[in-house]
Amino acid sequence: MSTFVYVPAPTQETPAEFAAEVVRDAIDAAREPAVVIAGALVSLVPDLVLAALRWPFHDPRTTPAEPAITTMACLILAKAWLTLTVSNMALAWLRRQPVGFLRNWVPVQTALRVGVVNIPLLAAIVLGSLVFVVPGLYLLAMWSQAPLAMIDGRARWFDAANYSASLTDGYKIPLVALWVIVMVATAALTSAIGAGLPFLGLGGAVTPITWAVRAAMSVWGAALGAAMYFNLDERAPWNRV
């Protein structure tokens, strides 16, 4: 007589459980000294350069000269490029691979491809948000992994959009929730610093504290983005044994 043993199916992971795992990994990555130092410097150096150049955009009565605008544009591009390297460092740490700024360096050719691909994707996200917020958030979640997919060598050009869509299938809600929480918390903290410190008579501390917050969010943003990609990649159907 045959004996049948009932084996329960594995419990389906909930969005909250996935988000919690991402946050735990992001916290771990954000504690890695190499990631902290690189992420903080990528944020602080442009701020210090602009302060040294007496950047005029803070005063609406001042029209900046063309060299100042060029400097700002170069700093923005350089910061975006180097942020990709910080994210790659965090991803390498999560994969228990050697971590180093030069070791995980993102070549300029890759950074340019990321920019070329993501500009139209961001334009579509903005248009979707203008029509209604939900389509914009949906597109943001769907294409959010395109940059790291290109850095990771899983895609080269616009195939990154399809690869990201496959990775995020079934995980869009927790991804959107995490990014919204981060953006709201950052905006609230920045506003509190800008309004609260002058009220307390500490107006001179607004700028350095704002820089410190930006540096911390630079590290956290890179770690969170890497943790999202790492967990999605681990759960991808084609990577399951």
Where do the model's predicted regions map?
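Hydrophobic alpha-helical membrane segments
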Residues: M1-V241
